[in-house]
Design a protein with these regions (language model features):
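Short amphipathic alpha-helix that is part of the acyltransferase structural core
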Residues: 1-19
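Short hydrophobic alpha-helix segments
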Residues: 8, 37-38
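Conserved beta-hairpin
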Residues: 23-36
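Conserved GNAT-family N-acetyltransferase fold
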Residues: 35-37, 48, 231
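Acyl-donor binding region in acyl/amide transferases
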Residues: 44-99
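Conserved catalytic-core motifs of GNAT/GCN5-like acyltransferases
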Residues: 97-109
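Active-site-adjacent structural segments surrounding the nucleophilic cysteine of cysteine proteases
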Residues: 108-177
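Conserved active-site-adjacent core of cysteine acyl-enzyme catalytic domains
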Residues: 110-111, 162, 166-273
Length: 274
């Protein structure tokens, strides 16, 4: 379990450098310190510096730090100017780009329009009910956006970090009905197939569960009492999967059979999987 803790919470009487615009943090994984960082904020632009102690998954660590900074401080831009080549390469995977000698990432403007809590600590959209400010076709994402949200989350899981508009508009603009009936599962599959090695199956609940067990992640289209819904899933261990944006704000961890039994009313579904 990752934890990001302010420096003065661990050492309340120890101040590294007193500045009102600079904040120091430690990153712990299962209680062990793996990194520290500080952020200097000037008018919603944050300058980041990171020191590594024992980080095995550097991309995951930097993603957690970045998501924390955007969620906590609502920064419009984050910059990185240190010379650590390993960190710089991983930040590029997080959509940081070079501007002179620094790397920077400008925060997606639609993300800043959404309420706090819309994105979780890993950068997944977990509160579709907060996305009414994001258009989707002739509608808004709160009512019709579960398909593109599932696609956005799956791409983010696989280190493809696109802007919200790039994902939502690419799906809504290719829909003949302007998203009046939500997202077409076939258009969703077509778009994802261009970026990821996904496969497709529409079948019975039993076959869907069997296929899910042989995949690491994907998108499930299922049917509940209010209609159809897309959710992204990923494998946690041999028998448990995490379902993102199935129940808003909650990270459900269930077996495929448990999920289908509890949340579906029809014994059929569609899966886009890897």
């Amino acid at each position: 379990m990752y934890q990001i803790i302010k420096e003065n919470q661990i050492f309340p009487n120890h101040v590294l450098e007193y500045r009102k615009d600079r904040y120091f943090y430690y990153v712990l994984l299962d209680g062990k310190r793996i990194a520290s960082f500080h952020i200097t904020i000037n008018t919603r632009v944050g300058s980041l510096s990171v020191k590594l102690q024992d980080a095995d998954d550097l991309y995951e660590l930097l993603n957690r730090i970045y998501q924390f900074l955007i969620n906590r401080y609502r920064l419009e831009k984050v910059t990185y100017s240190d010379s650590n080549k390993e960190i710089r390469e991983e930040l590029k995977k997080l959509s940081f780009y070079a501007k002179g000698k620094i790397l920077q990432r400008v925060t997606d403007p639609y993300r800043l329009l959404c309420k706090k809590g819309t994105f979780d600590e890993e950068g997944f959209i977990v509160r579709q009910d907060n996305t009414d400010v994001i258009p989707f076709g002739l509608f808004n994402s709160k009512d019709k956006g579960c398909g593109w949200i599932a696609a956005y989350n799956l791409l983010h899981l696989n280190q493809i970090n696109l802007d919200i508009y790039d994902v939502s508009s690419s799906l809504s603009q290719s829909d003949f009905f302007f998203s009046a009936f939500g997202e077409s599962v076939f258009l969703l599959y077509k778009m994802l197939k261009e970026k990821l090695p996904v496969k497709f199956l529409s079948h019975t609940e039993k076959q869907i569960c069997n296929r899910m067990r042989n995949s690491d992640c994907g998108i499930l289209l299922y049917y509940h009492k209010h209609g159809a819904h897309f959710t992204m899933y990923r494998k946690i261990d041999a028998d448990k999967y995490q379902f993102i944006n199935a129940v808003y704000g909650r990270k459900l961890v269930l077996s495929p059979e448990e999920f289908m039994k509890k949340y579906t009313i029809l014994h059929i579904g569609t899966i886009i999987y890897m």
